Amino acid sequence: MSTVAAPRFYAARLVGTSVFDPIGDSVATVRDVVVVPQTRTSARAVGFVVEVAAKRRVFLPITRVTSISPGQVISTGVLNVRRFEKRTGELLVIGDLLDRAVTFTDGSGEATVLDIALDQNRHRDWMVSRLHVRRRRPGGSFGRLVSRGETLTVELSAVTGLYGTQAEQSAHLLAAAYQ
């Protein structure tokens, strides 16, 4: 019995990738991934911020994406050119979550988020699943300049603080529910 690995992409590696329509014409470039936190340990991708001609950033819903692979994103070709505006409850992976400090749940210290992996589940939703982090070294500021901590990829459940503190996240989700 063989198992097929779920499709996965890393957000920071996808930035700068061309978005193609079904006939192969390049229509945009990926600039960010928009996610909506579901719980403390999950977030669902709802789309991409893409850049079209004249540096205009627009929203491409994930439902209009037919394929994501290294070097290319293929869409249905339908693109709304209204300027992107972040809504309440949405987070940008590159703009909001990268370089965020997180704490390991096992008490082994803190880390900085370098990249975020999204996996496709059986319902075809893209969910945040793993974080590529750099462990922070204890010590003064000079120690941080000289040596870097180790990098590792961990499950989302292995850290806390990605979406803010519990109080910040609760207030954020409550405000989103009323709008």
PLM feature segments, named:
Residues 1-179:
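Peripheral interaction segments used for macromolecular assembly
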